[in-house]
Amino acid sequence: MEKAIKEETFMGKDDCIFCKIANGEIPSATVYEDSICRVILDVNPANKGHALIIPKEHYDDIYSMDADTASKIFTIATEVAKAQKAELNPDGLNIIQNNGAAAGQTVFHFHMHLVPRFIKDTVTVTWVPGQSDNEELDQLSKALRK
């Protein structure tokens, strides 16, 4: 299955690997499933318990998803995170969701990563903080409110 995922990551929605996984055409270690999504354990985990939330309907990214579906997915993320906390007792959790190649998206079917974190793990999700000024922040916040 690992090879199949790597070979199909850039295919279109007609041959989408995550559509096939979410709809049960490809076997997976399923943690949760309902009519909206399937939650699986990642076959290439960043850490033990690394889960993926994959909607059954194909959405390329967050920009194409309706707010109701997004809300349901985040509610499921909350429940999965609590289960990870209870079972694995991590020191933290990263919720990661990439949109577009520039953001690191490699499978163009919306999905959310829930990565349990441990004090001495080697997972990195960091960036160098940029700088801004109050005027720039004020202008941008006004533009985004439109």
Where are these regions (language model features)?
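HIT superfamily nucleotide-processing domains
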Residues: E2-K146
